[in-house]
Amino acid sequence: MNRIIKTIIICFFVGFLNGQDTILSKDEVMNIAYAEAEQEGKNVFLMFDASWCGWCKRMDKNMNNNACKNFFDDNYVTVHLAIKESKENKHLENPGAPDFYDSLKEGTSGIPFWVIFDSKGNVLDNSLDSNNNNIGSPVTRDEVQVFVSILKDTSKLNDKELSVITEVFWDKAYD
């Protein structure tokens, strides 16, 4: 009897520990996001990123800045899908994410590449400007203006909130 109990306990802990390393698939991430967005009356802000991507980290840092974090949280369900990982970090990629990225981007695009969906999975907009260039993590005045315009069209953000976002994202050193 003790042997059976020990075996069950070991199996439980091995399963639990293995489960901690499980990376959700693109479908799992997106289905959870769509359901949450539907329930909360929000849109989905998807960012494709990678562990090595400095611009991705900058985008995250800006979106989570205390001055504007609530603006994003109140209007979007924000999710990430990892792609373009190095050979030794391929295990960090979400299964299905690279193909999803390829289906959404137009032409060549680096990361971060972001797409805004409604709660039904319809694309509302993405990080490509009118010239099909990826603004990714916007820093210049023009990039931030495009970003803020997209946010205005896909959220309930008011002009004051959009102004705060502009101040957080615009890095005058790049203009």
Annotated model-derived regions:
Residues 23-26, 69-97:
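Thiol-based oxidoreductase modules, predominantly thioredoxin-like and allied folds used
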Residues 102-162:
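Non-catalytic, surface beta->alpha helical segment in thiol-disulfide oxidoreductase systems
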Residues 44-47, 77-81, 113-116, 123-126:
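Structural recognition of the beta-strand scaffold that forms the well-ordered cores
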Residues 40-53:
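Short active-site neighborhood of thiol/selenol oxidoreductases, capturing the structured segment around
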Residues 1-22:
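Bacterial Sec-dependent N-terminal signal peptides
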Residues 51-58, 112-115:
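C-type cytochrome heme c attachment motif
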